[in-house]
Amino acid sequence: MRSLTEHQQHYRRPLSFVRRSNRLKPSYQRAWDAALGNELLEVPHGARDTSVAEGFTIDWREEFGRTAPLIVEIGSGSGEAIAHAAASNPETDFIAVEVYRPGAAQLAARIRREGLSNVRVACLDAVEVLDKLLPAGSVDELWIFFPDPWHKAKHRKRRLVQESFVEKAARVLTPTGVWRLATDWSDYAVQMRRVISASASFWNPHLGQRAGDISPLTQVRLGDLDAASLGKETHPLPYEQALDTEGGWAPRFAARVTTDFEQKSVTAGRRTFDLTFLRSAR
């Protein structure tokens, strides 16, 4: 049986993003050009311009000029959260993975403007970054805050946090690594909780907490808040069906600032679900 080439594998895997255009407006292009090879990683591409060429690696100690704890954020957007974290934690190095070029350009410009030397931006597919640029056991924390929920049933195969991704995350995290997640879409939160909890590579330090009446999931189901926030007809569940007896939701991560995106979600009446998982001993 013939094995798939890297090109074939990349095109067969459902992507968690859709790029509609690579064009940047002039101000973003200037920011991109100024940051490329500095704050913005210059990486040779594979089958797509979001993939990494086979065999290419980065020595992160050399890249940052030191040995330090490493935090990776996937889906950094324009960088509100990671720039704040980097400024507050100069002793830690950060990699911001943002597949959309306008966001990556804005983030790189923000890093340069704020004089942050401990952040690098990777405008790449997150799966490619985990598979090819991050050695096993090299990441102290992995952050995924408000990934695209792909809320239509036919698109859910595109969601980033699935069974296959969980083991990729496990590989790159240190034996004491932390995985922090947040979403404002209830069924994606349930999916995250389910697939990560099912892995022997992780355990939930908040197991059983925030269950029952105080669970954000119970609250969403009782009011069908997901539908309400979109202006759709609501179908609240009866109390017995709405009750989340499992819980396991984490308290809000104190270092996660409220971004413009999250504020819009709150204004629309959505609930935020936080999850924290710790790497199990190998």
Residues covered by each model-derived region:
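A short SAM/SAH-binding and catalytic strip from SAM-dependent methyltransferases
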Residues: 139-160
